[in-house]
Amino acid sequence: MFLGGFTSDMTGIKATALEQWCRGRGQAFVRFDYSGHGASSGRFAEGTIGDWAAEAIAVLDRLTEGPQLLVGSSMGAWLMLLVALARPERIAGLLGLACAADFTDYLLWERLDDRLRDRLQRERVITLPSPYGEPYIIALNLIEEAKQHQLLNRAELPIRCPVRLIHGMRDADVPWRISVQVMEKLSSPDTRLILVKDGEHTLSRESDLRLLTRTLGEMIESR
């Protein structure tokens, strides 16, 4: 089951590459769009981390059977962890790419200057340029609601399934040290962090995709 990133949709490079890889193995695979993303209904500016996590849990509950391997990209890796905390008995393993746990703080709020923070508090919703295409729509409610789901301020993350985290050391959006912090808090002794020295945030190059599928294959075979 694949969980995409903030503003991404299920037609992205990693989602479609994983589906193709799974089809080739006869492996079941689920990809979906959060509300306000891609083909799903809803307004993006009204979405929250809690909403999108609940939607991922609903997909897990309604569209899958038995223990599942979750693959989460960026924000999707944060949501992947929230799903695992909510449904531990349904999770066989987690594979996170450029894990953006708590990104609403260090990637959104903390990068706004005082002028933009004042504007966001007045207008509730603002747009910011994105290096990946369409401008980001930033809603104050997204940032405020996300505080309920923060992970990096917790002493421990009681997740005991196998976990693999892959992070590019040239990630200009989410520092690779975020994945280190997540790894340190996980209860699972079977946790590994793979750093890609020249990897950037999207991890969508052919070499990145090969690393992704190889790592996922190893997790499936070790179950």
Label every model-predicted segment.
Residues P135-A155:
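Active-site nucleophile elbow and catalytic-triad environment of alpha/beta-hydrolase enzymes
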Residues E19-S41:
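Conserved alpha/beta-hydrolase
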Residues G199-L211:
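Catalytic histidine-centered segment of alpha/beta-hydrolase-like enzymes
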Residues A172-I178, S204:
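Conserved alpha/beta-hydrolase "acid-adjacent" motif
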Residues E89-I138:
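Hydrolase active-site cap/lid region
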Residues H37-L63:
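Catalytic nucleophile-loop/oxyanion-hole region of alpha/beta-hydrolase
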Residues P158-I159, L165-H167, D171:
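Short beta-strand/loop motif that positions the catalytic acidic residue
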Residues F6-E19, R177:
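The serine-hydrolase catalytic nucleophile loop
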